UniProtKB/Swiss-Prot annotation:
This is 1,4-dihydroxy-2-naphthoyl-CoA thioesterase 1. Its EC number is 3.1.2.-. May originate from a horizontal gene transfer with a bacterial species of the Lactobacillales order. Its main location: other. It comes from Arabidopsis thaliana. Keywords: Hydrolase, Peroxisome. The active site is at 57. GO terms for biological process: phylloquinone biosynthetic process; protein homotetramerization. Mostly expressed in roots, stems, leaves and siliques.
Amino acid sequence: MDSASSNTKAIDPPLHMLGFEFDELSPTRITGRLPVSPVCCQPFKVLHGGVSALIAESLASMGAHMASGFKRVAGIQLSINHLKSADLGDLVFAEATPVSTGKTIQVWEVKLWKTTQKDKANKILISSSRVTLICNLPIPDNAKDAANMLKMVAKL
């Protein structure tokens, strides 16, 4: 298992199960990629919209968690526009950036682009999302060490 894959498994098991790998982890930018495989497609052999939504909320939550000083965060609203489809075999790139990082509420923008394995330079926007998160929640006792792996992987 390569380092990017093992990092994804450690910090976001659901995304790991789909084949997602993180590239950059910081309080101001989260990026990664997903090869569109049968496990993340709907019956028409295109990326399932729910997978795009999962990526959006996961990346925004991770960024908000870091930007809030590793406080507990929770998504309270997700809006996603599916603009184009990504076909089986395409490669999807994801980027989450903060729009607003307040002490209580954060808003993150998440964009997904597709490329083909043959032409990685030609990126086409497939979805655009806004994720609103509450970011001042208490951390329960059973999750006190939840941020440790993310801090280690992000080298923070």
